[in-house]
């Protein structure tokens, strides 16, 4: 998994080693039979705060009841255009979400290309995989991959992504150079959730933020 995540090229940009995103995939196996596994996955990513040694959580998502097959020494292959395996699709899907979330904190809606590719992965996986984990009804039909990428690619939720952008770039990143302005911007960003909640109550992206 480590090789798969670090050796695949997820964007058209080039990055130095220290620019790589600090993230983790915690996979807890809850059932298995031969090479077939059922697991819960917790995905975390962190973002450095400008001019500090502090990292802040940027993305946390728990995906319960995922299914995949894996044999010892099996290569995990990724393709942008076709389904290879559930494990490959899972790892690629969340890798792109992590990168998209990171980009969104530096420029408004900058992660949309990654989100669109993640949606493409979900679409072809739901067509060719026998697993129900790609469907909108997975995990009770609310907190799942389908609705996550639906929210991230919809213009209806741009205001929530803008809150995340302002919270990080105009808030946390300014704390060292101008803490008063930074705190004001952080408060303003969080207060915007109250306005957003009137139109999009308890949305999935709001739940992820907190």
Sequence positions of predicted segments:
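Flexible, glycine-rich surface segments
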Residues: 110-208
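Aromatic-enriched hydrophobic runs in primary sequence
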Residues: 15, 22, 30-32, 90, ...
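Residue-identity detector for threonine
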Residues: 11, 28, 56, 81, ...
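Structured segments of extracytoplasmic/periplasmic soluble domains
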Residues: 3-11, 94-105, 189, 193-196, ...
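Glutamate identity and glutamate-enriched acidic tracts
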Residues: 7, 17-19, 42, 80, ...
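Alpha-helical context
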Residues: 3, 17-19, 67, 71-75, ...
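Acidic/His-rich structured neighborhood in mature extracellular/periplasmic domains
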Residues: 35-150
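Start-of-domain marker
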Residues: 2-51
């Amino acid at each position: 998994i480590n090789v798969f995540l670090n050796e695949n090229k997820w964007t058209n940009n080039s990055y130095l080693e220290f620019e790589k995103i600090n993230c983790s995939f915690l996979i807890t196996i809850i059932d298995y039979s031969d090479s077939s596994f059922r697991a819960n996955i917790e995905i975390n990513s962190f973002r450095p705060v400008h001019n500090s040694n502090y990292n802040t959580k940027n993305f946390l998502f728990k995906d319960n009841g995922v299914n995949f097959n894996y044999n010892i020494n099996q290569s995990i292959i990724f393709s942008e255009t076709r389904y290879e395996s559930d494990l490959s699709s899972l790892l690629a899907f969340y890798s792109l979400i992590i990168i998209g979330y990171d980009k969104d904190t530096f420029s408004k809606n900058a992660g949309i290309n990654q989100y669109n590719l993640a949606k493409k992965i979900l679409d072809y996986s739901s067509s060719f995989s026998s697993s129900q984990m790609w469907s909108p009804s997975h995990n009770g039909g609310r907190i799942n991959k389908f609705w996550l990428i639906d929210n991230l690619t919809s213009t209806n939720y741009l205001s929530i992504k803008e809150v995340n952008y302002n919270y990080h770039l105009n808030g946390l990143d300014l704390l060292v150079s101008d803490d008063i302005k930074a705190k004001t911007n952080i408060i303003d960003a969080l207060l915007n959730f109250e306005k957003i909640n009137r139109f999009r109550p308890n949305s999935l992206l709001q739940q992820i933020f907190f």
